[in-house]
Amino acid sequence: MDFDLVLRDARLADAKPDQPATDIGVKDGRIAAIAPQLGGSAKEQVQGGGRLVCAGFVETHIHLDKSCILARCDCETKRFPHLAMERVSAVKHTFTVEDVTARAAGTIEKCIGHGATRMRTHVEVDPRVGLRGLEGVKALIDRYRWAIDLEICVMPQEGLLNNPGTDELMVAGLKGGCRVVGAAPYKIGRAHV
């Protein structure tokens, strides 16, 4: 078989100490073969030097729409300040699609550089920010598809029942490609229960 890439002399995570290193053949962006001294030709060969090869990291909870905004918020230095959500809420009306895209791209690039290959990001929708955060992050799915699988969770950070219009924005987010629905139950009163 011909490969696009062969990583030679690599150690798999489940390999026993006495097992020899192995080769990994990649074709069309996918692992096509794993075997010691893999035959066939390759457009590119990389020496693993006996180093560990493992699955990429998964970032399961990040908010790309709000990444890198600390300088815009008047936040305390405590781990989780009581007013953090309110301070973010006060500045998110300034978000533009282009602004979100630029900030989120920088964060994604850092995550890719540290080995992340899958990411689930929560993106706020409400009448204050509309769909700008979602559109800004959505623009990055195809741009970074080569390195990371980006899943978007649409989320009513400031509440659903207490924030008229949020439900329509959530539906629009789901119709627009979001695959997961998040929630912020601490913002909802208990009278309806």
Where are these regions (language model features)?
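Metal-coordinating catalytic core of metallo-dependent amide/deamination hydrolases
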Residues: 91-94, 121-190
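Active-site gating loops and adjacent loop-to-helix segments of metal-dependent hydrolytic enzymes
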Residues: 68-100, 172, 177-180
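Divalent metal-coordination and catalytic microenvironments
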Residues: 10, 24, 29, 50, ...
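N-terminal metal-binding scaffold of metallo-dependent hydrolase/deaminase domains
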Residues: 1-41
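Hydrophobic alpha-helical hairpins/lids featuring a short glycine-rich hinge
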Residues: 55, 60, 86-127
